[in-house]
A protein has these predicted regions:
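An acidic, glycine-rich, mixed-charge low-complexity segment common to nucleic-acid enzymes
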Residues: 1-77
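Compact beta-sheet-dominated globular domain cores
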Residues: 79-144
Length: 145
């Protein structure tokens, strides 16, 4: 039988660990997932990414449920992955989700970014997301009366 984590604690993001981002992949290969105004300006996109990560880490220190576990079939067994909300335009709502996994006991690595639709699909494979930012309607435009 497959084993996806060693302990239940592996499913909770450890805020005491350092987070290192794969900027070249996130901004090089996935810039098309960013809001349009940031796609044309990689310098602003990186600044927005750094700011959004800092915001998410502050929120996670107050509420561990902000970072949601995900399951990705291609990830190595025994590796927990997480989805961290990224509010890139500072409007209080997530625009993308950062995929994070442990590189070692003290470091997490931010691998890539997913659209909210992609993130919701991956998160619900573990359990129903218990989060205020990752909802079934994530990413859908608001209805206009």
């Amino acid at each position: 039988m497959a084993q996806y984590v060693r302990t239940a604690g592996d499913l909770v993001y450890d805020c005491s660990c350092e987070l290192k981002l794969a900027y070249s992949h996130i901004l090089g290969d996935n810039i098309d997932r960013f809001p349009l105004d940031l796609q044309a300006n990689p310098v602003r996109a990186r600044q927005a990414l750094d700011s959004a990560v800092n915001w998410a880490l502050r929120k996670t220190r107050r509420n561990y449920k902000v970072v949601v576990p995900q399951w990705y079939p291609a990830a190595p067994e025994d590796t927990a992955q997480f989805l961290m909300p990224l509010d890139l335009d500072s409007d209080g709502r997530a625009d993308l989700a950062l995929v994070v996994s442990k590189a070692n006991e003290r470091i997490y690595r931010g691998h890539t970014v997913l659209t909210l639709e992609m993130a919701y699909s991956n998160a619900r494979l573990v359990a129903r997301p218990d989060s205020e930012w990752l909802l079934p309607s994530a990413g859908e435009p608001d209805e206009v009366d």
